[in-house]
């Protein structure tokens, strides 16, 4: 009981010291209240839920025309970043539990092991194959590396390394280097893949002290 009281007092003190943290907590609570898909760890794409909703940002027109019950990877992945930020800002263990019990189990619904290298696809992997975007996976890699830094959990670092292998598969010598935007449509090498890609590589270097990540990070930074 004393431990619970202490956590409540600490959370209250932090929130009052920084009103932005309180706003962030309220935003996250509202998101889960309004977007949660019943009986899952997944989220809806929009609110109120519209069964006729169609995504307009997928590379494949066939996928874009499909009606989907759950959110796509890109909006879902924002919860990973949000919970990480709150965990780092508050050091409140409830966010660590939220990460382990809701965010990551839901995220794994998007993990695609039918194609190599393994990576996260734009829609849940129990459905027909969907596009895999390098920029989406870069941000997930950053989040996994940050989670490792905060918790010391080795599994998070291993997942980040696995994602990095996928990112490297999207790099070639066309235009002198750089990472493509989408695995299925290698038509452009966008800043949204390469700038955070450099950040991801350098975070991996900080976590591992492996010079290969430092080299790749510098190359992506200079190319971008």
Task: Please provide the spans of the model-predicted regions.
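N-terminal glycine-rich cofactor-binding segment that shapes the pocket for flavin-like pterin cofactors
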Residues: 102, 133, 146-150
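Aromatic-lined, polymer-binding surfaces characteristic
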Residues: 134, 141, 190-194
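Active-site cradle of extracellular carbohydrate-active enzymes
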Residues: 191-194, 201-205, 212-224
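Well-ordered alpha-helical scaffold segments within catalytic/enzyme domains
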Residues: 77-93, 139-153, 196-209
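Low-complexity, Ser/Thr/Pro/Gly-enriched N-terminal "stalk/linker" regions
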Residues: 11, 16-127, 154-177
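Sec-dependent signal peptide recognition
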Residues: 1-11
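Lumenal/extracellular "mature" regions of secretory-pathway glycan-modifying transferases
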Residues: 128-129, 175-186, 211
């Amino acid at each position: 009981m004393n431990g619970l009281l202490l956590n409540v007092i600490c959370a209250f003190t932090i929130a009052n010291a920084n009103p932005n943290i309180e706003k962030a907590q309220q935003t996250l609570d509202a998101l889960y209240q309004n977007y949660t898909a019943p009986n899952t760890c997944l989220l809806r794409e929009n609110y109120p839920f519209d069964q006729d909703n169609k995504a307009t940002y997928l590379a494949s027109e066939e996928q874009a025309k499909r009606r989907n019950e759950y959110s796509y990877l890109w909006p879902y992945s924002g919860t990973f970043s949000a919970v990480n930020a709150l965990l780092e800002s508050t050091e409140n263990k409830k966010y660590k539990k939220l990460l382990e019990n809701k965010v990551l189990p839901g995220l794994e619904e998007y993990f695609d092991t039918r194609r190599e290298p393994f990576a996260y696809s734009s829609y849940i992997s129990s459905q027909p194959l969907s596009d895999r975007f390098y920029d989406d996976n870069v941000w997930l890699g950053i989040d996994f590396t940050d989670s490792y830094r905060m918790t010391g959990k080795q599994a998070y670092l291993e997942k980040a390394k696995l994602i990095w292998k996928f990112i490297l598969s999207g790099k070639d010598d066309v235009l002198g280097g750089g990472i493509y935007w989408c695995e299925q449509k290698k038509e452009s090498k966008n800043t949204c893949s390469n700038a955070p890609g450099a950040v991801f590589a350098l975070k991996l270097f900080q976590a591992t002290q492996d010079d290969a990540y430092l080299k790749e990070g510098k190359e992506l930074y200079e190319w971008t």
